[in-house]
Regions:
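Hydrophobic residues on conserved beta-strands that form the core of alpha/beta folds
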Residues: 60-62, 77, 112
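Short, cysteine-centered beta-strand-loop-beta hairpins and adjacent loop/turn segments enriched
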Residues: 82-93, 121
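A solvent-exposed, acidic/Ser-Thr-rich amphipathic alpha-helical stretch
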Residues: 21-69
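Hydrophobic/aromatic beta-strand elements that line small-molecule binding cavities or substrate pockets
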Residues: 44, 48, 62-67, 80-82, ...
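A generic structural micro-feature
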Residues: 55-59, 70-74, 91-95
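Short acidic-aromatic low-complexity motifs
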Residues: 1-23, 53
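Short beta-strand edge/turn micro-motifs at domain boundaries
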Residues: 75, 96-123
Length: 123
């Protein structure tokens, strides 16, 4: 599987409300989301479990995915519309976001080693 296919599979899993931690390397450093910072593989896994537990009805629309692979490393950037419902606060969220990050090949799979998601105007 290519790095690009892994990213698209991650988007599909996010839409479907499936577990996401397996997409990250065991030694993943950090995942930045809108308003959050998850550090280390345990922190990333816990944050993603909580996200899956407390959200539903995801829309993930990729508008400009660009991926570069070189050897066992890959990096990417994308403009993504993300929308979801928070089932605890009963709020709907809808954002145009920018994604970037790095992946490392492990055997036949790619795993994220870092990811950054931001919305224009984030502070």
């Amino acid at each position: 599987m290519s790095a690009e296919a892994t990213i698209e599979e991650y988007y599909d899993a996010l839409r479907a409300g499936e577990p996401l931690a397996a997409f990250f390397a065991a030694d993943a450093l950090v995942k930045f989301g809108i308003g959050e910072r998850l550090e280390g593989s345990d922190g990333i896994a816990a944050g993603l479990r909580e996200q899956t537990r407390t959200t539903e009805d995801w829309i993930v629309e990729s508008h400009d995915l660009r991926v570069m692979e070189e050897g066992e490393w890959a990096w990417f950037a994308d403009d993504v519309r993300m929308a979801w419902d928070d089932i605890e606060s009963d709020e709907h969220h809808d954002h145009r976001t920018r994604w970037s990050g790095g992946l490392r090949r492990t055997d036949d799979d790619w795993r994220f080693v870092g990811m950054h998601v931001s919305a224009p105007g984030d502070s």
